[in-house]
């Protein structure tokens, strides 16, 4: 698609689009009457150190807006696609520290960089089913980073009464201004052991998927 090539070839265009989207999200946030669920639990956990934040890809737009930045920095993982580039700009506009995960980057290099950020006190954020699905199917990345970092895992979801569902693979939620909404953080109670056999990992994936779905249900206004 032409617009993808244009973004790939122009960091300026990605920056302009990212700023426009961030401005729109600020408007939506400011004009929405939010009910917050679990925010205090997240803040209490952040007082003890970084966390791993996991969400379904459809909730990506408002995640940077709702993150409690004054309680701790979040390094959000993104891909290097044109949409990922714009997403990185949006995240940066809300004070986050996005990290591009290139397919050319070795697992060792990625692990080293992520662990370095955690050691700096930064939490790690990623989508459970991203970047391209299948929708609502948890991939191993969230479990791998929870295991590697030893950080507690929180799941996130939000919903607004007024919104549009985009025609994307994940049916991404686009909030509309002047409405009511709910934003949810919930701690995932399971622990990922340093070593786990395939059956145990399958059980953990199913449990994390249930936690993500539960947060989404809780967020319905």
Model-predicted regions and their roles:
Residues 49-105, 149, 164:
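Catalytic core of membrane glycerolipid acyltransferases/transacylases, capturing the structured
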Residues 15-36, 75-119:
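Membrane-interfacial amphipathic helices and adjacent loop/beta segments
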Residues 107-112, 133-136, 162-166:
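Short, well-ordered, mixed-charge alpha-helical segments that flank or form enzyme active sites
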Residues 113-145, 149:
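Catalytic-site beta-strand/loop segments enriched in glycine and acidic/polar residues
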Residues 101, 127, 155-158:
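Generic beta-sheet signal
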Residues 137-196:
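A cross-family acyltransferase "interaction/gating" segment
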Residues 1-66, 89, 179-180, 203-221:
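Membrane-anchoring hydrophobic helices of lipid-metabolizing enzymes
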């Amino acid at each position: 698609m032409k617009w993808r090539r244009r973004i790939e070839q122009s960091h300026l265009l990605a920056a302009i689009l990212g700023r426009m989207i961030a401005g729109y999200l600020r408007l939506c946030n400011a004009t929405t009457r939010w009910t917050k669920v679990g925010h205090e639990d997240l803040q209490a956990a952040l007082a003890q150190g970084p966390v791993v934040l996991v969400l379904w890809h459809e909730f990506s737009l408002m995640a940077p807006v709702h993150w409690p930045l004054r309680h701790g920095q979040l390094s959000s993982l993104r891909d290097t696609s044109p949409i990922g580039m714009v997403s990185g700009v949006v995240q940066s506009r809300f004070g986050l520290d996005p990290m591009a995960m290139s397919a050319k980057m070795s697992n060792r290099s990625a692990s080293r960089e992520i662990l370095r950020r955690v050691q700096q006190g930064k939490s790690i954020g990623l989508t459970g089913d991203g970047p391209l699905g299948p929708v609502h199917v948890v991939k191993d990345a969230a479990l791998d980073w929870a295991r590697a970092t030893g950080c507690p895992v929180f799941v996130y979801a939000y919903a607004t009464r007024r919104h549009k569902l985009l025609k994307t693979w994940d049916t991404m939620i686009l909030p509309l201004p002047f409405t009511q909404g709910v934003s949810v953080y919930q701690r995932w109670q399971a622990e990922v052991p340093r070593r786990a056999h395939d059956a145990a990992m399958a059980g953990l994936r199913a449990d994390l998927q249930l936690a993500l779905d539960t947060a989404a249900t809780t967020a319905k206004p």
